[in-house]
Amino acid sequence: MKQKSIEMLVQGASSLGITLEMFHVEHFQKFYSLLLEWNQKMNLTAITEEEEVVIKHFLDSLSVIKSGKIKGGEKVIDIGTGAGFPGIPLKIVFPEIGLTLLEASKKKVNFLNFLSQVLLFEGIEVIHGRAEELGKVERFREKFDIATARAVAPLNILLEYAVPFVRVGGHFIAMKGRDIEEVYQCKNALEELKCEIEDVIEVRLPFSDILHHLIVVKKVDVLPSKYPRREKAIRTKPL
């Protein structure tokens, strides 16, 4: 990475309340290098220009810190992580979190496993599978302090994918864009899935005019066993 990109990463992280040391920067540099290398073999990301990756992938991922829920030591699952966003940047900054990356694409899982080995991560597990299936598995169901998702699906659909993994009292952090009208259209999903919206946090990404929101959802009771439903039901008959 060029010096300008490194400075943007460090300054941008600082504006989010994060101090990056040199070893953090080195990890991000390795991440970027491997992202470009593997992206030539598979579709990991359409964003490859250095400064864009810093802003739209690295700093966007780190913006989850603004939720105030990740302080280190939490069990975190990143659902539909893709190329590792936001999970890997969070793990770089908070190596003590226990991180599970859930991804349905086997090729992306292979990339994430290789990346984790290169970065010498401990306390990380990469799972090849689908959220609506693993959310019913005892080893994963209601076992995490925090679930994250950067997917583009509507919030009421994301809730059914994510909430089954979250323990009672834990949180789901949905990374959404500028428009958050859907927050006011998911009352039924919140009631059915035994959760409530605790906070909506506006985040303006450093060095850009991009406005995002973090939707912080708290799990308040044990989830009924019928959830999550099968994918077709989730998609065609959303709560």
From Swiss-Prot:
Keyword Methyltransferase assigned to the entry: answer is yes
UniProt subcellular location = Cytoplasm
Alphabetic keyword roster: Cytoplasm, Methyltransferase, rRNA processing, S-adenosyl-L-methionine, Transferase
Which is one Gene Ontology cellular component term of this protein? cytosol
* Keyword set includes Methyltransferase: yes
Going by the entry's taxonomy, the superkingdom of the source organism is recorded as Bacteria
Q: Name one GO molecular function term.
A: rRNA (guanine-N7-)-methyltransferase activity
Instruction: List residues binding S-adenosyl-L-methionine.
Output: G80, F85, E103, A104, S105, A131, E132, R150
EC number in record = 2.1.1.-
According to its UniProt record, this protein's enzyme class is: transferase
Family, according to the entry, reads as follows: Belongs to the methyltransferase superfamily. RNA methyltransferase RsmG family.
Q: What does this protein do?
A: Specifically methylates the N7 position of a guanine in 16S rRNA.
Q: What is this protein called?
A: Ribosomal RNA small subunit methyltransferase G
Q: Which gene encodes it?
A: rsmG
